[in-house]
Amino acid sequence: MDFAGRVVCRDVFEYPYPDPRTLFPALESKLARVNQALGANASKVVGVGVAAPLWLGGWRDFLGAPPDALDAWHEIDLRSRIATMTGLPVEFAKDTTAACAAELVMGQGRGIHNFLYLFVGTFIGGGLVIDGRLHGGPHDNAGAVGSIPLRDGGARKPARQLLHAASGFVLERLLSDAGKPAAAAHDHRALSPEMWRHTEEWLDTACPAIANALTSAAALLDLEAVVIDGELDRQMVREIIRRTERVLDRFEWEGMVRPQLLEGAIGADARAMGGAILPLYAHFAPVHELFLKPATEAAY
């Protein structure tokens, strides 16, 4: 991404779970292709931004990954590994915090100054903006909405945390169990008549769970808005907002200010674009700590 926020080059590597034995060779290969595509402009690259979960070795039961693949992350310094690979400075942020940074700089954040950000990817996660600044907190984990405990899991079965009810992987499994392609959870096919029954089953659990989490957040944070985005079809994002608003209509708001729900402006690439912002702010922003993780390393 260039200084004006334009995406210069884009590539994708899909994997069922983050296995460093396959991820790093693929990443090295793709970075080499990017450098080749940039040609003479490769020398102008100021750094690499990494947007990744803080705990890459977690939630193995849901990813279906072998223990040895995820355990390896506990011994890996991701920032150092990529710096060695590229020879460039590396900046790091939690993936959904990076997505929130993109929304703050290039999306709804240009008009609102206090908002909670939700991103529905494989897992649901988020970020937090207070007084126009990205707020990470002492552990750089503010806005970890996926870990909010739930009072109940909606219509079907109990869920321990919001991520068990409202994450994309839940819809992926519903589709897969029905003999449908799991990847359809993240595009227009999820809204097709053929798959709508499974999508609606997910929405019936996800939206009440999101609404419950948002009431707690609104009471604690006094928000202007909640911005919802995801690695989803845009109509699906709007359907989540519509159904969540319907649930919120039934809640008692006395003593609280109900935040407006807004559709994110960036979309599926928010995490990657937020990551790409990080080196630019490290070099050019007057107070780049507002956007970047401190030097202390995350636990993978």
Regions found by a protein language model. Give the residues of each.
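ATP-binding/phosphotransfer module of carbohydrate and carboxylate kinases, centering on a glycine-rich
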Residues: 1-44, 84-86, 152-300
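Phosphate-binding/catalytic loop of phosphoryl-transfer enzymes
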Residues: 3, 44-160, 274, 278-297
